[in-house]
Amino acid sequence: NRWLAAYTIVHGVEASPVERTAAGELQRYLETITGIRLPVTNAAAPPSPCEFLIGRTGRSFRADVAGLTDDGFAVRRCGGLTAIEGTCGRSTLYGVYYFLETYGGCRFYARDCEVLPSPEAFRLPDAIDDRCSPALSFRDVDWFEAHDAAFAAKLRINSDHNRVHNAAYGKTMHYAGDRFVHTFSAL
């Protein structure tokens, strides 16, 4: 995985707290998997041929999020550039977790149960062009583990029911007043 050492993680100059979390999570998981700690910088730094671009960076290489629904994201890779961008900051974080699952082989089963690939197994294809839109605008499960905002983000849950979210994990969706279920009468 020496090829990875040439990379930098780049977020926008005015990145939101959740986009900074997304860049930090990518850095943390790549370091845990490979032992290589990539630097994180903002887009004011000069471009390099090997970058992970997180969110709206202003760089010419980007992922196309046009036409995606709320919380949609896109992942694009060509050569040494990989862009992960969402329709909002929270969906950029979802895109990072999708990238780690789909191309990194990571599995997030519970707050204290994650399966990460061996360093030798971590490989990226030369080209990626994925676009993802959630089928449902409101997503939740009533499972104690998912009440943790950090773990809920890995599951791409956006409900505020029994969760205390903060700026690091993005805004949540509130639905049908203070109810979680049996909401028909509230509509």
For each of these PLM feature ranges, what is it?
Residues 1-74, 120-129:
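Acidic, contiguous N-terminal accessory segments
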Residues 17, 22-25, 29, 66-187:
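Feature activates predominantly on carbohydrate-active enzymes
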